[in-house]
Amino acid sequence: LQNTSWIDMLKFKISYGAQGNDNIGNYYAYLDQYTVSNSNNDFALALSYKGNKDITWETSHSFNTGFDFEFFKGRLSGTVEYFSRKTTDMLYNKPMNASAGYASIPMNVGSMTNKGVELDLNGLLIETNDLTWRMNFNLTHFKNTINELDPSLNGEMISGSYIYREGESRYQFYLRKYAGVDENGVAQYYKDITDAEGNVTGQEKTTDAPNATRYATGDILPKVYGGFGTSLNAYGFDFSISFAYQLGGRMYDNGYASLMNSGTDPGQNWHKDILKAWTADNKGSNIPRLSATDQYANYLSDRFLTKSDYLSINSITLGYTLPKSWVRSLNISSLRVYMSADNVALFSKRKGFDPRQSYTTASADVYSPIRAISGGLSLSF
């Protein structure tokens, strides 16, 4: 590579490590634990925790490899990296039937892999005595896969609003599917029709939401996320702007769902979309009617899943550095005037919904970052 003029620097890196985890909420998860009670001078033992003598550590194996590079006399630099983290013997408190006499049992339920690529680029587009223009861009592509589950789980495990299946993401939603409204404006949900052997033979609609079938309805994880920006310095002026983005993935808009109630909760506010609800004069609507007796109108379903794509303007800065000849008489070596704005704007699927949250269902009480505008002076003596 010494004879390759356009390569300034090329560095290969690789790392591997393993880490254990025993965080399952009990220091003695391998032991049955009892409480002793004394009532009317009679002693009794009651099972307070069901242990698992076969439980072991959860172990994560992390592997990273990639390149750092600098090309064309420093005009293009960056990093390309592949990462993989395989977690084996995953810890989980498996819920049990009430007839077992205990609520759950700790166990190692399988293995999971997180892997992806990261790209970070920095470019020097123009550099003269009076003008410098730089750009940067980064992205991360990330995929989660459940490799295997304990044989006792028969290939899948349900936990709340999620379903864990071998070969699929652990962030897969497991919700009822909304089927619009019936002829009276009552919310409907899909339900599988099964034969005597339990095989699915068809599908029907039902207004009894708790008995509707739940389905895998989308992955929370985005396909790609990252940021980009640019900076420009010319004739004493400096300008910079940075963006963040996310593509792919879905989130549950809990705030919107709560504002689309059918009137069962007195004193609760409504979203303006409730004006489009079904009425005798608006039978083409797919929004349930307003009725204090319709408790399943905004039931947990894919109706309130929304794309988590977004583009945000994170910051904008504009400044001007006065010529030295102007400030030299004040015994100042440098004076810069600037204004900046942070959290400028967010563009997403639904107004009022901020997808910049953790990979869980959206909460109704999450506040977006506050927009801030400031200005100032920078002095050097």
Annotate each PLM feature.
Residues 1-168, 235, 300, 305-381:
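Extracellular/periplasmic, surface-exposed regions of secreted and cell-surface proteins
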